[in-house]
Amino acid sequence: MNKLPYLILSFAPLVISACANGPSKPRVSMADGMRTVTAFAETQPVPDDDDAADDPYIMVTPTGDTVVAGTNKRRGVELYSLGGQRIASIDSGRVNNIDGIYDVQSASFRIAGSNRTTTQVDVYQVTTEPVAISLTTSFDLPLKEPYGLCVSPTHIYVGDKDGVVQAWTWDGQGPIATFTFESQTEGCVVDTRNNDLYVGEEMTGIWRVALDGETPPSLFAATDDQNLVGDVEGLDIYHGESRSVLLASSQGDSSYVAYDLASAEQLAKFAITSTPDDSIDGTQDTDGIAVSNTATSAHPRGLLVVQDGFNVDQDQRALNQNFKILDWRDVENQFARDSVYRDE
C-alpha cells in the first residue's frame, strides 16, 4: 500500500486571467454542433427547492444490485433505485459532496460526506439488502466550510472554498497532507491505479497531484471558452480494460469533457439532451458526477450519473433538482472513432 507523505504542499497554479476576471457567461444547455446523449432514467426530484441536489455516488453490489446515492445539500443524503425511485434517506445536515468504497468484510458500502452544517466529515454505512443508510461516525475539520470531497480505500480528501484540500484517514487521523490552490476547488477524484489525485480548480482547470509527494503538481487540463468552460465541477474516472478516462463537468456551457487519463488528450465533449418524447429532460449547470465501470446484465459497460441543475417535466414546468442516469456505452460512443480510443 502506498502511504501518503506527512507534508504540507503549497503551490501557485497557473491563473487564466480571461476566465477568472472576465464577465460571467450565460448558462446554456448545449453548444452548436456538440455531440449529445440522453438519459435512460432520472431520480425523483429532491424534496427541497432552489440549489439542493449536488453530488452522486453509484453503488453496484457483487450480485448486481444498483443503488444511487445523491446529496441534498440542504438536509443530507438520499438513496435511489436504478429506476430513480427514492428508497431511503438520512437527514444529517448540509452534506455537499460524497464518495465511497465497497467494504468486502461487511458486504456494505462506506460513504464519506462533507458536512457544511457541522464542519465535519460524516461516514455512513449503506446496505443494499435491505437498502438502508446510517451515520456511523463523524470527525471535525479545521476548515472554514468543507466543500469538495473524494476518497480512496485508505484516505478521504476534502477541500474548502479557499482552495485548501486536506487528506485524512477514514478514522479521522489528520490532516496528514495539505494541498493549497490559489482559488476555489470542488470536484476531485483519486486515481488509485497510479496514486494520483485530480482536483478541479473551478476557474483554472484540472490539476494532477502525485500522492507520492515527489512529483510537482501539473495542470492536466486548463479552462478556456471552448472546451473545458469554468466552473470546473464534478470529476470522476472510468477505468477500462485498456485505458482510463477522466470525465469532467464543464458547468460554464452545461457540457461534459472526457480525457484520456494517460495522455490528457480530449476524447469527446458532449451534452445531455431530452429524450425524443421529452419524458426525461436534458441537463444544465451540472455540479457532481459519478461513473461506475462495474458491469450488470442491463449495462455491461457501467453507468454515469449526473446532477441536473435545471430539472423540468415533460411540459417544461420547473421541478426541484434531480439526478440523471445514463448507460456508459452511450457516453463511450461519443469518443473518437479511431480504434486507439475505443475500449471494446
Indicate where each model-derived feature is located.
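Bacterial N-terminal signal peptides that target proteins for export
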Residues: 1-8
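C-terminal motif of bacterial Sec signal peptides marking the signal peptidase cleavage site
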Residues: 16-18
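Sequence/structural signature of beta-propeller domains
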Residues: 20-344
